[in-house]
Amino acid sequence: MEQSMSSEQAERVAGRVEQLGGFQNNESINQRALLLLQRNRQRRQLLQRQEDRTRYIPDDAKRRVVERVAEPAAAESRADGAREEERAARPARPRETRRIAKKPQRYRPSDVALQEIRRYQRSTELLISRMPFARLVKEVTDQFTTVDQQMRWQSMAILALQEASEAYIVGLLEHTNLLALHAKRVTVMRKDMQLARRIRGQFI
């Protein structure tokens, strides 16, 4: 009997010890549960406040808020659509294209001279500016007239003189260039112009 009583007491003590340990674990679990409950209550309170605000806000204000929220989203969607269209419109570049630095195109001096000759042969415009030519004509005529007898020029008369003088100069330079080429030279020299004037019958 004594042995059975001692074994029962030992079992009871062990059970109490286990219960105490379980109580301690349960206390930590209970603390966590309380924290979670408090957080949930706070969230519910916040949600209720937001719902109360939306209830008491008039419909016009709600629409304004919705429009303010919707406008940036619509603008972003439009911008995205425009970017996609631009990308689709661009021609697709090959992936393995290497950018090669282009060298500036350089012409020889002879090519540039030939281009200028062709351009001036096609054009019919006057090469000498009008005002300096008119001043030169007036200076020359003033040398042969007195102060009382100054000559006056019409604009068409000065223009006719300019046309004639430019035609003469162009013809003389053309013959001078031909004589330089005949002498197996490219550079025009003074003696070429003298010979051209002598052949024409115009002595220096």
Curated annotation (Swiss-Prot):
Histone H3-like nucleosomal protein that is specifically found in centromeric nucleosomes. Replaces conventional H3 in the nucleosome core of centromeric chromatin that serves as an assembly site for the inner kinetochore. Required for recruitment and assembly of kinetochore proteins, mitotic progression and chromosome segregation. May serve as an epigenetic mark that propagates centromere identity through replication and cell division. This is Histone H3-like centromeric protein CSE4. The keyword Ubl conjugation applies. It is found in: Nucleus; Chromosome, Centromere. GO terms for molecular function: centromeric DNA binding; protein heterodimerization activity; structural constituent of chromatin. GO terms for cellular component: 2-micrometer circle DNA; CENP-A containing nucleosome; kinetochore; nucleus; peroxisome. Belongs to the histone H3 family. Ubiquitinated. Is degraded through ubiquitin-mediated proteolysis when not protected by its association to the kinetochore. It holds the Pfam family Histone. Component of centromeric nucleosomes, where DNA is wrapped around a histone octamer core. The octamer contains two molecules each of H2A, H2B, CSE4/CENPA and H4 assembled in one CSE4-H4 heterotetramer and two H2A-H2B heterodimers. Interacts with the inner kinetochore. Keywords: Centromere, Chromosome, DNA-binding, Nucleosome core, Nucleus, Ubl conjugation. Gene3D superfamilies: Histone, subunit A. Residues 68-107 are annotated as: Disordered. It comes from Eremothecium gossypii (strain ATCC 10895 / CBS 109.51 / FGSC 9923 / NRRL Y-1056). GO terms for biological process: 2-micrometer plasmid partitioning; kinetochore assembly; mitotic sister chromatid segregation; protein localization to CENP-A containing chromatin; rRNA transcription. Residues 77-99 have a biased composition (Basic and acidic residues). Residues 89-202 are annotated as: H3-like. InterPro entries: Histone-fold, Histone_H2A/H2B/H3, Histone_H3/CENP-A.
